[in-house]
């Protein structure tokens, strides 16, 4: 099946947007739904079935749903996982259609590709916390780790939640975040791309806090959630974090 693609790779589309025309099909395809690619075919036109980002690979085209993925914005705090180590940069999975780029000069002072092996600093699978320095949809987002508290994550645990649930995890004027930190005694860093970094002074508190976070994610739409989370933490921890926070 030969396609005439009329959208750009990684373009944002809406339901009903035409993505491509089928050429040399032999006969007209009146209607065919392709649910795993989130598109359907109507009169030899490939059409988006939802709001998402187009992924074009050769003669294959699909739409990645925006629900559950993160669209970068400048200055956002993000946590990424190193998925590729290059000669001059690392590629980070930031739970987005757009991979994050962390240049070696951000991590290695006086970087020289002839001297420095990037794997000696960050390797595949490492977690990194940083900020979106540049992003304009014409290029992959550039990550900076220059700043207090940024860089390789070497302690604690990283939990993933849907990016769309992050505002509920923070709460109005930080109410849910303050509840979680005060009652658990843990240090919590919430990244906009749906990763949460926890540093607790014991394993049990970390386990309970993860359960509370998953409860918030599951019931984000429900009223009275703050009180339910408070009761859950009181029951599991018996009185909160006693003000003990890690530096």
Swiss-Prot record:
One Pfam family from the record: KH_6
Membrane-spanning ranges: none
GO function terms (MF aspect): poly(A) binding
Domain of life: Archaea
SUPFAM superfamilies xref list: Eukaryotic type KH-domain (KH-domain type I) (SSF54791), Nucleic acid-binding proteins (SSF50249), Ribosomal L27 protein-like (SSF110324)
GO cellular component, one term: cytoplasm
InterPro entries in the record: Exosome_RNA_bind1/RRP40/RRP4 (IPR026699), KH_dom (IPR004087), KH_dom_type_1 (IPR004088), KH_dom_type_1_sf (IPR036612), NA-bd_OB-fold (IPR012340), Rrp4 (IPR023474), RRP4_S1 (IPR048565)
Keywords, in A-Z order: Cytoplasm, Exosome, RNA-binding
GO BP annotation list: CUT catabolic process; exonucleolytic trimming to generate mature 3'-end of 5.8S rRNA from tricistronic rRNA transcript (SSU-rRNA, 5.8S rRNA, LSU-rRNA); poly(A)-dependent snoRNA 3'-end processing; RNA catabolic process; U4 snRNA 3'-end processing
Disulfide bridge partners, by residue number: none
Compartment annotation: Cytoplasm
Domain S1 motif, chain residue ranges per copy: 75-148
Domain named KH: residues: 154-220
Biological role stated in the UniProt entry: Non-catalytic component of the exosome, which is a complex involved in RNA degradation. Increases the RNA binding and the efficiency of RNA degradation. Confers strong poly(A) specificity to the exosome.
Family: Belongs to the RRP4 family.
Quaternary structure, from the entry: Component of the archaeal exosome complex. Forms a trimer of Rrp4 and/or Csl4 subunits. The trimer associates with a hexameric ring-like arrangement composed of 3 Rrp41-Rrp42 heterodimers.
UniProt protein name: Exosome complex component Rrp4
Source organism of the structure: Thermosphaera aggregans (strain DSM 11486 / M11TL)
